[in-house]
């Protein structure tokens, strides 16, 4: 006995056996379980469920039957797996939130979008849906091949006739060994239009097909952001799209609330609500006062109550980012083509479906032709019998047996076995004249039908015409409205949309320290208060640039080297009111010998606003603001400077302003900005003022009605002169004298346009600072030398002058925010030569 057992033992290589067995298992999973067939869009389990229901007569026009009966039929005859797997698949086929077009018409509890499980199969009932009947239509007309079931006792279809492109219409998902498929559902009418377009133009491109099939259409609706992901998936077979819930913000009793009407595909509504509640509880999202689900049979409605002082749009953007209100859907158009897994693009999916339909129509036509020819053959025999009726009757009466009669008919009239048998089977009522006419009419129709069927088989275009006609009938019968919207924007919000919009004050000191404060910091005191300390600075430092803007506005920083940098308001650190700030070199990639000459806050880069540039050598340039909408992190050149030249200042204009320019030697010129034609960003510019000798520009400003021109000299002298004293000239001239330069007062250091509401900061080369009210400076004539503003010691000189709108050390509501006309506190830094 032991020897006999030993002889049955076979030694094998375990490594080779593992490879072989694993490959067999992998291919079994790929081909027989996890991946859909490109022709009918179904995996074996879906195909078996529908086939079993069709065989059981559970069609859409019949009564519902117990789900357990269907499951038993499937696992008993075709699908040797667990009953739960089959039932769960059938349940999904009956869920309107899982399938774009349900293939099973369920009766009872088939689960919900909240993740509730379906009732047990013994309680629920089902039948085929109307549209699933189109998948099995003509199945009994030899349109498909059959194969043995798992034990060879039954036959099952290899593929369904699938009279509509189910692979794209209902999509598919599945995980095989080493590969996975994830095909989104689509709108039936659009996919049919795509097939029709392909049938008319086999050379059609994927972009042209996308004119008919713009993108997926999910049963839960929602919105697809952008088209690039769709385009990539349709062209390559792989891609990713972003799905966002469909929401609206509505006013209710003076407050806002967010209403969610549709959620992304495959998102569990109950878990989504739990996640939002968890974020609120953990204080990761602020501003939600109430959350409830008001969904009913009329549709979905999730209500998110927003706190009165919260921004609903910012809150919604945070929800998009932190919850499943916005998800991504990875597309992988992987399907079985002739039994092999293949990644397909959109056109290939439709081509394989169309080729399948051509085969189905040709096989159906051939089947109908065989049937028609067989019937015509019988009718030919009946016609012969009717033409020789008396002789036929006599022959039959004289025959002893049916076999003798049949053989006699076959021999006498040269009939086939089938024809002779049909004559013997014919009832006597068929011998009447009326019945004879019916046979003749039927025979004539059959001859015409046979000719028609043969013509179809002989002409490929006729086959395509039939496919087109039947697809159009399906479209008319089952087409509905698209559920999922497709937005043109790739992503409707960025990180900045998660940041509340607020008005802020931004300061930059002479030594390059910058910070941001909420404007409420300066509005917390009552009128007439002493004010608060706005910032802590060193004794030799002061606020040189101070302006109000919005946290979402773009701040442009122009340097003496002609470069421009940009920051968003919220990118500047928010610090306490007494904090010094952080070095601006930590935020901008400026070089060691580079400094900020002008700061301009921009709300929007419009076409009707301009930037006016003035260099140290008197070169002027005017460029559209929109040219600076896209600035790299490392900055870019705003003006092409000549060798040795520097950018003195920049001003924002509306295209209808006047400019005044002052030079070190006391000359000034006033001209209209339109004298400088518009130029590109990289242009050098044109002559704004003619300079003599070693003269250079020390000031440039925009002329405002009712304001004065203020000049400060190297020896600390200064004066105010009415703007009207400076006549308008043409750009490029030498200008007119604005100050009588003497050894006593020295050359000009600064020229600015000021009002009585401004303050003036004057700093000497040794760091001594004095602050003056502009209203305290005398108004004198244009060619006078001015009065002493700051006393400078022998060998000392004024280095820099800054105009300040808001007093930094005594800011309160009355003396700060209201004095910030035009958000303008730009200050140019002069240099002592």
UniProtKB/Swiss-Prot annotation:
Biological-process GO terms, alphabetical: DNA topological change; DNA-templated DNA replication
InterPro entries reported for this sequence: GyrA (IPR005743), GyrA/parC_rep (IPR006691), Gyrase/topoIV_suA_C (IPR035516), Topo_IIA-like_dom_sf (IPR013760), Topo_IIA_A/C_ab (IPR013758), Topo_IIA_A_a_sf (IPR013757), Topo_IIA_dom_A (IPR002205), Type_II_DNA_Topoisomerases (IPR050220)
Gene3D superfamilies from the UniProt entry: 3.30.1360.40, DNA gyrase/topoisomerase IV, subunit A, C-terminal, Topoisomerase II, domain 5, Topoisomerase, domain 3
EC number: 5.6.2.2
Gene Ontology CC: one annotated term: DNA topoisomerase type II (double strand cut, ATP-hydrolyzing) complex
Motif (GyrA-box): 525-531
Compositional bias (Acidic residues): 806-821
Active site, per annotation: 123 (o-(5'-phospho-dna)-tyrosine intermediate)
Intracellular or extracellular location(s): Cytoplasm
Keywords of the record: ATP-binding, Cytoplasm, DNA-binding, Isomerase, Nucleotide-binding, Topoisomerase
Keyword match Iron: no
GO molecular-function terms, A-Z: ATP binding; DNA binding; DNA negative supercoiling activity
Catalytic EC class: isomerase
Top-level taxonomic group: Bacteria
Subunit structure: Heterotetramer, composed of two GyrA and two GyrB chains. In the heterotetramer, GyrA contains the active site tyrosine that forms a transient covalent intermediate with DNA, while GyrB binds cofactors and catalyzes ATP hydrolysis.
Similarity section: Belongs to the type II topoisomerase GyrA/ParC subunit family.
Other comment: Few gyrases are as efficient as E.coli at forming negative supercoils. Not all organisms have 2 type II topoisomerases; in organisms with a single type II topoisomerase this enzyme also has to decatenate newly replicated chromosomes.
PANTHER family documented for this protein: DNA GYRASE SUBUNIT A, CHLOROPLASTIC_MITOCHONDRIAL, DNA GYRASE/TOPOISOMERASE SUBUNIT A
Role this protein plays: A type II topoisomerase that negatively supercoils closed circular double-stranded (ds) DNA in an ATP-dependent manner to modulate DNA topology and maintain chromosomes in an underwound state. Negative supercoiling favors strand separation, and DNA replication, transcription, recombination and repair, all of which involve strand separation. Also able to catalyze the interconversion of other topological isomers of dsDNA rings, including catenanes and knotted rings. Type II topoisomerases break and join 2 DNA strands simultaneously in an ATP-dependent manner.
Name recorded for this polypeptide: DNA gyrase subunit A
